[in-house]
């Protein structure tokens, strides 16, 4: 045995050095035990072709030693057993099949001797087109908030499990083996639910599948599988009917997409209701729907009236007829009528009759039709612009009494610089000037700070009052002083 494994491992190492193999597969093979490795190479022809350089049209078989394990094994006997390979053609394989059956029975007996009370289930996976089994997916419902997504995952997973059990009934003949398979193919909360729940082990594998499915629906979707099945079916049928009624086909080029949608929804309904929904399908087809409906009524049979594909085939044939008619009508436009009289097979029945002719009048190039020019509509309103002065224009500031704007002006009372007349500290000593200033301001005059450059005119004002003889004596004395009073402005 050890020598056999050593020989096979040498072949595997050679294939690794040549980079002609899958590294993961080689590592997995080398991690097997001696008996499992030799058995795997004996059962799978592809491994022997790939690593042991066998031809595809031959079958090789590695014969195990029939000696008892208590007897000592020598290296020479192992080498002779390894090199004694029975090579036979495919047509002469009766002896090889018998030896393979004996080998399988021996291997099964050894496994039962290791654990005589319970044998773990060994599933072969889902059958595929290539002949090899594909591993089923592991169910993990952790952190999936959508109940619809959970329902789809659970249904798909249970379909795969039921397919494995039905195709391998000998391996999964008890409910305990089915539960073990489900436990190994779940993760997270689904696996803990299978472990913690109490199951009836004495029931059949088919019933244990239904119980686990009911438990999954209750715990992870919140539905009673037995009671909600009818409600879910009614809801599904109602929704499909609404979608079929609302659907419409506007462009006949989208016939395939429309038919795909219609076929998906019609299969959600009951089978006996198919004919009336197919009639509705034909009525939704534009242009040729009426002709297709008439053909369907005349050509349908007891079986084809339930087929949506039969209705679509009629529609496609009508579309082909319509397209051919369009092509011929385009060709007839270019056909000359002069050839009809020459090539006519019927005798001439009209004599001296004028044929209706259509004259084409050419329009003179002098007169051309007047075409109004297109004008774009203004989407804005024209605003009246106001005059906005630029940076070189500014308003004239009003002049002040003191244009310089500072306290260097000369006082009008004391003729000193540094203060204004209203702040003059010498007002008491110049009361006469103050009176004249107040009187002039009341009359609307203002004193000038700068010297007057124009012609200066001086006016005098005399006040004459009618007095009595008694008062003339007093006024004569004061007349000298009053005559000298002059006001200059």
Swiss-Prot record:
Any single biological process term in GO: viral penetration into host nucleus
Location relative to the cell: Virion; Host nucleus
Intervals of motif Nuclear localization signal: 107-110
Molecular function GO terms recorded: nucleic acid binding; structural molecule activity; zinc ion binding
Compositionally biased residues, Basic and acidic residues: 87-101
InterPro entries: Caulimo_coat (IPR001988), Znf_CCHC (IPR001878), Znf_CCHC_sf (IPR036875)
Domain of life: Viruses
PROSITE patterns documented for this protein: ZF_CCHC (PS50158)
Keyword hit for Mitochondrion: no
Listed SMART domains: ZnF_C2HC
CCHC-type zinc finger locations on the chain: 409-426
Residues covered by region (Disordered): 87-111, 466-489
Cellular component annotations (GO), alphabetically ordered: host cell; host cell nucleus; T=7 icosahedral viral capsid
SUPFAM superfamilies: Retrovirus zinc finger-like domains
Alphabetical keyword list: Capsid protein, Host nucleus, Metal-binding, T=7 icosahedral capsid protein, Viral penetration into host nucleus, Virion, Virus entry into host cell, Zinc, Zinc-finger
Quaternary assembly: Interacts (via nuclear localization signal) with host importin alpha.
Function summary: Self assembles to form an icosahedral capsid, about 50 nm in diameter, nm, composed of 420 subunits of the viral capsid protein. The capsid encapsulates the genomic dsDNA. Following virus entry into host cell, provides nuclear import of the viral genome. Virus particles do not enter the nucleus, but dock at the nuclear membrane through the interaction with host importins.
Membership in a protein family: Belongs to the caulimoviridae capsid protein family.
Protein name according to UniProt: Probable capsid protein
Protein's organism: Figwort mosaic virus (strain DxS)
């Amino acid at each position: 045995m050890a020598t056999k494994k050593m020989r096979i491992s040498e072949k595997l190492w050679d294939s690794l050095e040549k980079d002609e193999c899958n590294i993961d597969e080689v590592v997995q093979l080398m991690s097997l035990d001696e008996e499992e490795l030799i058995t795997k190479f004996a059962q799978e022809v592809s491994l022997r072709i790939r690593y042991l350089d066998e031809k595809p049209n031959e079958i090789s078989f590695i014969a195990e030693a029939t000696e008892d394990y208590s007897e000592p094994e020598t290296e020479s006997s192992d080498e002779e057993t390894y090199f004694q390979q029975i090579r036979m053609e495919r047509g002469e394989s009766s002896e090889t099949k018998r030896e393979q059956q004996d080998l399988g029975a021996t291997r099964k007996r050894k496994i039962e001797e290791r654990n005589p009370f319970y044998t773990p289930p060994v599933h072969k996976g889902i059958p595929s087109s290539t002949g090899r089994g594909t591993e089923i997916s592991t169910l993990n419902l952790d952190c999936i908030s959508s109940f619809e997504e959970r329902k789809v995952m659970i249904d798909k997973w249970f379909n795969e499990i039921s397919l494995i059990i039905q195709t391998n009934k000998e391996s999964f003949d008890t409910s305990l083996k089915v539960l073990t398979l489900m436990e190994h193919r779940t993760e997270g909360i689904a696996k803990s639910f299978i472990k913690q729940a109490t199951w009836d082990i004495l029931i059949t594998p088919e019933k244990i599948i239904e119980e686990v499915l009911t438990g999954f629906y209750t715990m992870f979707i919140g539905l009673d599988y037995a009671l909600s099945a009818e409600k879910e079916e009614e809801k599904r049928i109602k929704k499909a009917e609404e979608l079929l009624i609302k659907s419409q086909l506007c462009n006949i080029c989208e016939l395939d997409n429309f038919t795909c949608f219609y076929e998906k929804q019609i299969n959600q309904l009951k089978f006996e209701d198919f004919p009336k929904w197919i009639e509705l399908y034909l009525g939704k087809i534009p242009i040729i729907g009426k002709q297709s409906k008439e053909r369907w009524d005349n050509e349908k049979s007891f079986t084809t009236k339930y087929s949506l594909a039969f209705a679509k085939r009629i529609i496609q044939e009508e579309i082909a007829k319509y397209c051919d008619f369009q092509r011929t009508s385009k060709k007839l436009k270019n056909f000359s009528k002069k050839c009809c009289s020459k090539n006519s097979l019927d005798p001439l029945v009209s004599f001296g009759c004028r044929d209706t002719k259509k004259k084409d009048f050419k329009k003179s190039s002098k007169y051309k039709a007047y075409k109004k020019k297109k004008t774009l509509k203004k989407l804005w309103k024209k605003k009246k612009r106001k005059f906005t002065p630029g940076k070189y224009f500014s308003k004239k500031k009003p002049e002040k009494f003191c244009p310089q704007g500072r306290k260097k002006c000369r006082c009008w009372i004391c003729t000193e610089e540094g203060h204004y007349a209203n702040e003059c500290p010498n007002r008491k000593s110049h009361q006469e000037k103050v009176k004249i200033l107040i009187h002039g301001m009341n009359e609307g005059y203002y004193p000038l700070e700068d010297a007057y450059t124009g012609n200066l005119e001086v006016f005098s004002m005399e006040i004459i009052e009618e007095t009595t003889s008694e008062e003339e004596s007093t006024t004569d004395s004061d007349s000298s002083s009053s005559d000298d009073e002059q006001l200059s402005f």
